[in-house]
Regions:
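Intrinsically disordered, low-complexity segments enriched in polar/charged residues with Gly/Pro
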Residues: 22-25, 42, 81, 96-98, ...
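Bacterial Sec-dependent N-terminal signal peptides
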Residues: 1-26
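Generic anion/oxyanion-binding catalytic loop in active/binding sites
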Residues: 10, 36, 54
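Short solvent-exposed beta->alpha transition segments
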Residues: 29-30, 45-98
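Short, low-complexity N-terminal intrinsically disordered segments enriched in polar/charged residues
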Residues: 19-41
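Exposed beta-sheet edge and beta->alpha loop/turn motif
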Residues: 93-169
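Intrinsic-disorder-associated interaction segments
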Residues: 21, 58, 62, 134-137, ...
Length: 169
């Protein structure tokens, strides 16, 4: 009888841990997709919401970051770069630490650049400091792990940043 109770308790604890993991992954997907949709719509307020505070600080603060994002959105609207579709793939890596949760997630983008169709396979670094309730993202396409660590010294060395690639049609 005692062994059965121990097994039931162990099973319930395992299910609880799994459900907690699913909650933070679900939140990450929801927020990464919100950011992807904001990219297509040119919604700079939402883009700023999911931009890591260290990146905002490096841009000179919220106001300057907002101006930089607005400038980027204006470039998109000018027609030289037209993002057709952005989708978020399945998490490839996750590291759970005491202070944060970090993950790598693919970001697939179909776009038109100066009249040429292109498909981009990028990777986002996602990080949360509150158990997965609120996520921040950084595109790793034009960065190295060393450069990312300048912004995020807490970046776990176990994470492998895959190389991004763009194909033109």
């Amino acid at each position: 009888m005692g062994k059965k109770i121990i097994w039931v308790v162990a099973l319930l604890l395992g299910l609880h841990t799994t459900s907690q993991a699913q909650v933070y992954i679900d939140n990450m997907y929801k927020q990464a997709n919100a950011m992807a949709n904001a990219t297509i719509k040119g919604d700079y307020t939402t883009l700023l919401k999911y931009t890591h505070p260290a990146m905002i600080k490096s841009m000179g603060g919220k106001e300057q970051a907002m101006a930089t994002i607005k400038q980027g959105v204006a470039m998109l609207k000018s027609g030289s770069l037209n993002i057709k579709k952005v989708s978020i793939g399945k998490v490839t890596q996750t590291v759970v630490e005491k202070e944060n949760i970090q993950c790598i997630v693919p970001q697939l983008m179909d776009m038109r650049i100066a009249g040429v169709d292109a498909h981009s396979n990028n990777y986002l670094l996602g990080i949360t400091y509150d158990g997965g309730k609120n996520w921040y993202f950084m595109n790793t396409a034009s960065s190295t792990p060393e450069k990312l660590r300048q912004f995020l010294p807490e970046l776990n060395k176990k994470l492998t940043i895959p190389k991004s690639n763009t194909t033109y049609k």
